[in-house]
């Protein structure tokens, strides 16, 4: 799904204040950076919602420890009719997490943090809006 966060990103990475939003306008308003989530490998899990007179049992894709996470692709698209996305040069392995990205002041790069699932290192990459190529800016 484009620009709508999976449960694990909503709950654990972006936070509830994101309201599942997984897209970000460039400072010059010419492009939109977004995350595309593939939840198909994430197991379903029942979650009870107490709202309403009788409540509701909802089925949601919820990755428990050791189970698959969603795979994520990072796209950048121009804000014009017919534009095609440029995909950031990351693999779509579910064994990694991406943090909330931010734009460079000149709107030429989208900065993205990435860490492996075991969260042993944090890398900050700059991604070119022109071709999706990336380069490492910082490792922590």
What is the role of each PLM region?
Residues 18, 69, 93-98, 119:
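Loop/turn position at the start of each blade in beta-propeller repeats
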Residues 16, 54-57, 98, 110, ...:
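Short, surface-exposed linear patches
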Residues 21-24, 33-39, 64-68, 102-105, ...:
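Beta-strand C-termini and the immediately following turn/loop, strongest in propeller blades
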Residues 79-80, 84-116, 129-131:
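Long hydrophobic segments that form regular secondary structure
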Residues 73, 100, 123-125:
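Conserved beta-strand and immediately adjacent loop positions that scaffold enzyme active sites
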Residues 1-2, 86-89, 134-140:
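Beta-propeller fold detector
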Residues 2-3, 41-43, 94-96, 119-121:
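A short local loop/turn or secondary-structure capping micro-motif enriched for an aromatic residue
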Residues 1-24, 31-87:
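Predominantly five- to eight-bladed beta-propeller fold
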């Amino acid at each position: 799904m484009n620009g709508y966060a999976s449960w694990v990103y909503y709950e654990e990475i972006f936070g509830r204040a994101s309201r599942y939003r997984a897209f970000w306008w460039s400072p010059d308003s010419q492009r939109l950076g977004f995350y595309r989530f593939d939840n198909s490998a994430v197991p379903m899990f029942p979650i009870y919602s107490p709202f309403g007179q009788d409540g509701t049992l909802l089925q949601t894709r919820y990755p428990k420890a050791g189970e698959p996470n969603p795979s994520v692709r990072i796209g950048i698209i121009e804000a014009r009719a017919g534009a095609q996305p440029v995909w950031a040069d990351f693999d779509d392995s579910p064994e990694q997490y991406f943090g909330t990205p931010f734009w460079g002041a000149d709107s030429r790069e989208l900065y993205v943090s990435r860490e492996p699932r075991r969260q042993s290192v944090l890398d900050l990459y700059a991604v070119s809006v022109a071709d999706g190529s990336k380069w490492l800016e910082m490792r922590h």
